[in-house]
Amino acid sequence: MAESLKGCSVCCKSSWNQLQDLCRLAKLSCPALGISKRNLYDFEVEYLCDYKKIREQEYYLVKWRGYPDSESTWEPRQNLKCVRILKQFHKDLERELLRRHHRSKPPRHLDPSLANYLVQKAKQRRALRRWEQELNAKRSHLGRITVENEVDLDGPPRAFVYINEYRVGEGITLNQVAVGCECQDCLWAPAGGCCPGASLHKFAYNDQGQVRLRAGLPIYECNSRCRCGYDCPNRVVQKGIRYDLCIFRTDDGRGWGVRTLEKIRKNSFVMEYVGEIITSEEAERRGQIYDRQGATYLFDLDYVEDVYTVDAAYYGNISHFVNHSCDPNLQVYNVFIDNLDERLPRIAFFATRTIRAGEELTFDYNMQVDPVDMESTRMDSNFGLAGLPGSPKKRVRIECKCGTESCRKYLF
């Protein structure tokens, strides 16, 4: 038995840092973990809990990484080398002092409630940083994700799993395309109109990868059966998000939002709306539950008929956090790539105008396109953000908080 186990390995359930902390707690050297007699008694600041000033000397109550709260100690500032943590502590302290007392200069001793707030804020930052790392570990796209909350003490959403593509529900099948194009150059020399032409539609992009079709018309991209390669100009949505984006807490009661950290050119692809694909019957059942909770993320796939719905409540990507606006900077398009079932399009967001770095990304939850255009996609009437009021029996009008000049005052 022992012979058969040679060469086997198992994953450790503790992180590298946690193992180092265990060594220091037990006062054990471990060269494999980088713990030697020289650094065995090196301590790392996890966060700062309190502040006081005695005469002209500043002191901080330090929570040490790997040690319980009871082992926290008061340390003079000159003993601390954690510049980033010190700066963040004072930034949080000054912001809260301004909010509470309309002044930013710290007192010689902090009120216990203020000290407790700073501890909760430090713990929140650590939780958000771990969540940010988790999101980036799971993403398959080029664009990085950052997370910020400078508004309240809310941490990562519970029971939300980041996914990069549709999660197919029970009884639903995504059939793979059987054929692809034979083009030498899909943009300039398309054979038989390339993949769009094979479906009797127009080529969607220009040579910069910007959509040139009007909203409501479908996009047919090259697929896994096509002769062309990854750099084909008709492969845009399938390459995923390429902009660095930030999930941030809004300061006007709209919950989480998303802003771009880079400039986005007009008509450029920004992101897909992904989640669980469920039947309309299942969507109706879930919608009644979500109504009672005051939160729902249902998106009808009604390109040709209303058979399926995307539910991003618990499984989704960064689009889960994009807010509504009556004057949005994102527009929805139906996209077909490896699955050509018109009842199951992929939902892609493109920029309606140039979007500046730092600007929030939004789309209209109650989208409308030209009524003569039957190839439309609209949000389900149940769509809403977490925390919005709702009723399982009688739909209430939800007040819009987008704040734009063209605001309709109500989402639905």
Swiss-Prot record:
What residue spans carry the region label Mediates interaction with MECOM? 255-377
UniProt entry tagged with the keyword Transmembrane helix: no
Family annotation (SMART domains): CHROMO, PostSET, PreSET, SET
The UniProt note on how this protein's activity is regulated states:
Negatively regulated by CCAR2.
Q: Which residues bind Zn(2+) 3?
A: 186, 222, 228, 232
What does the UniProt keyword field contain? Answer: Acetylation, Biological rhythms, Cell cycle, Centromere, Chromatin regulator, Chromosome, Differentiation, Metal-binding, Methyltransferase, Nucleus, Phosphoprotein, Repressor, rRNA processing, S-adenosyl-L-methionine, Transcription, Transcription regulation, Transferase, Ubl conjugation, Zinc
Please list where the region (Interaction with SIRT1) is annotated. 1-89
Q: Name the gene behind this protein.
A: SUV39H1
> In what residue span(s) does the Post-SET domain sit?
396-412
Name where it mostly resides: nucleus
Q: Which reaction does it catalyse?
A: L-lysyl(9)-[histone H3] + 3 S-adenosyl-L-methionine = N(6),N(6),N(6)-trimethyl-L-lysyl(9)-[histone H3] + 3 S-adenosyl-L-homocysteine + 3 H(+)
Enumerate the spans annotated as Pre-SET domain.
179-240
Name of the protein in its database record: Histone-lysine N-methyltransferase SUV39H1
